[in-house]
A protein has these predicted regions:
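Short, Lys/Arg-enriched N-terminal segments with co-localized hydrophobic residues
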Residues: 1-5
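Cysteine endopeptidase catalytic domains of the caspase/legumain-like
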Residues: 18-422
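Cleavable N-terminal signal peptides of Sec/SRP-targeted secreted and luminal proteins
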Residues: 7-20
């Protein structure tokens, strides 16, 4: 006998599935040739999403378009994450470079948060664009977010400013309260990226996958001297270690791998070589979801494979010095002015932080604490001190290990110490 009517719950589920759509946002939060790795991995992510079947009109791409014409770029108009010393390499820009929705002039906290929050009128006001690309998603849709930049405990860099953990949580909460998505995956590449999501409420239905925990640095990969494509040296780090591994995995297993498998295998691979703890936060029940919940259902084309063993890994805080040293080595010139200036700037910042530590902890305790991390400390205090070092003293991100160690030691008490920043 034919059933007169389909089960209402089953019918609702099928209709919801039919109406559901997938959207993605890719943000590079920085500019400059030293940050080539953020440009290249963001571009690779865009290419992978397109290959997986996400239509271009369902992807928002904000990144530094000036990287293509950067004077130091040996391959203008191209972007590579992987070296290929004697071959043509894998150029990601062949797909991404014609699809910038927002460029370097738009990389500001206000615009990023407005785009993420789907506030079209605010984006219009801030950008001057008549028809800016802003999504208007529904409670049936899924959203994938990728953000790559420098970070610190409690936030990430965005252009010449910062986006705080609180601001990101507020944007996600606003979307959730407006029923603008069913599920969200947020991938964050930044030093101390775990600090942005370590208190993320599970009820927001967001799965956060970060390159590091709340206190550790992220690492760059394929840095000089392993920075060559077809005989030309890039003179910078080509990509980020965490990104290369998870992108390799989803490129080869995009139709079968789950969020949890992607996390665990990336975590384990990175942990074999570095003290960089890839982490996960938020709604961890989403670990069993296939990656195709957020990316397309088509297999991503497998191309050049990342070697099983990484090449020339450099902590993100040390990239400028590493790059300057190799520029001096390769040039053969006696002029070491660029390297000298960087070494002086780093020494100045170290002295200022050591003076701060000595004034609060005393010289002997500061000297003991500067080479090892304090595991128990007040994170709100640390965030305040890090922000003051940037705002009052002009220190730059990412902070080197010694700065982080001294700040953590200072913040081992309950209260934020009184500091004269003059």
């Amino acid at each position: 006998e034919v059933v007169d009517a389909m089960n209402p719950l089953l019918l609702f589920a099928l209709l919801s599935l039919a109406l559901a759509d997938k959207y993605a946002l890719i943000f590079q939060g920085d500019t400059g040739y030293t940050n080539y790795s953020d440009s290249s991995n963001a571009c690779r992510a865009y290419e992978d999403l397109i290959d997986s079947g996400i239509p271009a009109d369902h992807i928002i791409y904000m990144a530094n378009e000036m990287i293509h014409s950067e004077e130091k770029n040996p391959w203008p108009g191209k972007l590579f994450t992987l070296p290929d010393p004697e071959g043509p390499g894998w150029d990601h820009a062949a797909v991404c470079k014609e699809h910038y929705d927002y460029t370097s002039q738009h990389i500001t906290p206000e615009i990023v948060l407005a785009v993420l929050s789907q506030d079209e009128e605010k984006v219009k006001q801030l950008t001057g664009l008549e028809n800016p690309k802003v999504f208007h998603t529904t409670e049936d849709d899924t959203i994938f977010v990728y953000y790559s930049d420098h970070g610190y405990e409690g936030g990430v860099v965005c252009g010449s400013e910062r986006i705080s953990k609180r601001q990101i949580h507020e944007a996600l909460t606003s979307l959730h309260e407006r029923h603008a998505y069913s599920k969200m995956a947020f991938f964050l590449e930044a030093c101390e990226s775990g600090s942005v999501f370590d208190t993320l409420p599970a009820e927001l239905n967001v799965y956060a996958f970060t390159s590091a925990n709340a206190t550790e640095l992220a690492w760059s990969e394929h840095c000089p001297p392993d920075d060559v494509v077809n005989g030309k040296e890039f003179g910078t780090c080509m990509s980020m270690f965490y990104d290369n591994e998870y992108q390799r995995l989803w490129e080869t297993e995009s139709t079968t791998i789950t969020l949890g498998e992607l996390f665990q295998r990336t975590h384990d691979h990175v942990a074999k070589y570095l003290h960089q703890e890839v982490s996960e936060y938020g709604n961890l029940s989403m670990r069993d979801l296939p990656m195709t919940t957020f990316i397309g259902d088509k297999p991503i084309k497998a191309r050049t494979m990342v070697a099983s063993k990484p090449s020339t890994l450099v902590a993100k805080s040390e990239v400028p010095l590493h790059v300057a040293k190799w520029a001096a080595i390769r040039s053969g010139k006696k002029d070491l002015s660029e390297l000298r200036d960087l070494v002086y700037a780093r020494a100045k910042e170290e002295i200022e932080v050591m003076r701060l530590g000595a004034s609060i902890l005393g010289e002997k305790e500061m000297d003991q604490k500067k080479d090892g991390d304090t595991l128990v400390y007040n994170s709100a205090c640390a965030t305040t001190l890090f922000e003051n070092l940037m705002d009052k003293c002009g220190h730059t991100l990412p902070f080197p290990s010694m700065t982080r160690n001294i700040v953590h030691a200072i913040c081992s008490g309950e209260a934020v110490p009184c500091v004269n920043w003059e």
